[in-house]
Regions:
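Bacterial N-terminal signal peptides
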Residues: 1-9
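Non-catalytic tandem-repeat scaffold regions and their flanking low-complexity/translocation tails
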Residues: 18-424
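Boundary at the C-terminal end of the N-terminal hydrophobic targeting segment
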Residues: 11-18
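Intrinsic disorder/low-complexity segments, especially N-terminal tails and targeting/processing regions
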Residues: 9-11, 34
Length: 424
């Protein structure tokens, strides 16, 4: 999945850092209000709703793509806010099918429909269960952001922190649990108004190292989204319904491409560097050669690797999941970094169980060698996060080449007695 880390220096919390939700913490009712947990409409209505939304929102294209997408997002969010989450997701599917150009903003749109859903410790798990892993699990992330955002300024009891995800434990599909814990990280950044240090401390209140690291990934995804809005004027991220960081929040330094990773405690640094490419690439105008050089300056070999993995994830997104575009970007970095770039790409291609075949096909398109082996190791890491039992992991690692299988099962931790993932 993704990994992130703490920010070394942030301004003290203030409502200025949470400009986009001014007044929300002054709404006590939001802390006890919830969307209905029983849908009132069925997914079969999605086609008609999608057609209606597309017709109503098309005129906004003349103003900007952001206005067009925001119009669609508002319409879908109106469905989910009323408890019709599956219908909202189905409508998003139909919209993307009708206008494939929107696939690149499918995650922000799913995030927006999730953020529209209010929940309480009693209802959060039931509402989250209506989401799934489509669109890089944006629905989960949005619901959890709203859950914590609504509680800004209130004490965060341990029961409130744990309630959303504890109901998802004990299943074979542990990816749902990862998604929830990752979403908690997003939400904690809302709660703490972009103070990553405070957010990470709350992540450390979770039960296990795996839980905590899954949470870190959400904290620093949110940090980097805030940095994009703050430094690079990325309007598209507004569809996530993120608050806008205030000018006093130091989320990134363009003259120091290793910040904030080089200013964070060692425990969080690996997660940070896995996401640092999200900040490096816009700073170097998407020049993968220059971005690779920035990764090389991370110092520690493990951190350099994580940075290259992040470059691969970005390559997959920038190429709209097209294999040729991924290879073109990854092949610009140093020869030692290319295999790890491929690993990052496949972990993005196969971000969720429903996308596993797409990642496997990418690895099979590569020639035998280090790049292909590292790609299959990346598949294994994903598989280890998707399934908790060895049988399912072995089944997912099938390939015609024994070398593929060996790399995959090693990544999945099939022969180990410890969880395959010690990080998200």
């Amino acid at each position: 999945m993704l990994g992130f880390a703490a920010i070394g220096v942030l301004a003290s919390p203030s409502f200025a850092q949470h400009e986009g939700h001014a007044g929300m913490s002054d709404m006590p009712a939001d802390t006890i209000a919830t969307a209905p947990t029983t849908p009132t409409r069925t997914v079969s209505d999605s086609a008609a709703i999608a057609d209606s939304l597309l017709s109503a929102c098309k005129p906004h294209i003349g103003h900007s793509i952001d206005a067009y997408a925001s119009c669609l997002g508002d319409g879908i969010a109106a469905l989910s806010s009323a408890g019709n989450i599956a219908l909202a997701m189905g409508t998003l599917d139909r919209i993307v099918h009708s206008d494939p150009s929107l696939i690149l903003i499918g995650h922000p749109l799913a995030h927006a429909l999730g953020y529209a859903v209010r929940s309480t410790p009693v209802t959060a798990t039931r509402l989250l269960s209506e989401c799934d892993d489509r669109y890089q699990s944006g629905c989960y992330h949005g619901i959890l952001q709203r859950y914590f955002d609504a509680r800004m300024g209130l004490p965060l009891a341990q029961s409130v922190l744990l309630a959303p995800c504890d109901g998802l434990r004990g299943t074979r599909e542990q990816f749902r649990l990862f998604d929830c814990l990752h979403g908690v990280g997003h939400g904690l950044m809302m709660y703490h108004r972009y103070d990553a240090n405070a957010s990470l401390k709350d992540c450390d209140r979770l039960a296990s190292d795996w839980d905590q690291r899954s949470c870190y990934s959400g904290v620093f995804m949110e940090n980097n989204m805030g940095a994009h809005m703050q430094m690079f004027a990325d309007e598209q991220l507004g569809m996530h319904r993120h608050s806008m960081p205030g000018p006093s929040a130091v989320l990134f330094k363009p003259n120091d491409l290793n910040y904030p990773c080089n200013a964070t405690p060692a425990r969080y640094r690996r997660e940070c560097y896995e996401l640092q490419a999200d900040l490096i690439l816009p700073a170097v105008k998407q020049d993968y050669r220059k971005a690779g050089a920035a990764c090389d300056s991370a110092g520690n070999a493990d951190l350099v690797r994580e940075c290259y993995i992040g470059l691969g994830r970005n390559a997959s997104g920038a190429a709209a999941f097209q294999y040729a575009g991924i290879k073109k970007r990854c092949d610009q970095v140093s020869p030692a970094g290319v295999p790890f770039c491929y690993e990052g790409a496949v972990r993005h291609l196969a971000y969720a169980p429903s996308e596993l075949s797409r990642g496997v096909a990418f690895c099979k398109s590569l020639p035998e060698g280090d790049g292909r082996s590292r790609c299959w190791d990346g598949v294994g890491l994903q598989v280890g996060g998707f399934f908790s039992d060895s049988t399912s992991r072995q089944r997912a690692c099938r390939s015609e080449l024994e070398s593929d299988v060996a790399a995959c099962v090693e990544g999945a931790g099939v022969a180990r007695t410890v969880p395959a993932r010690d990080r998200p």
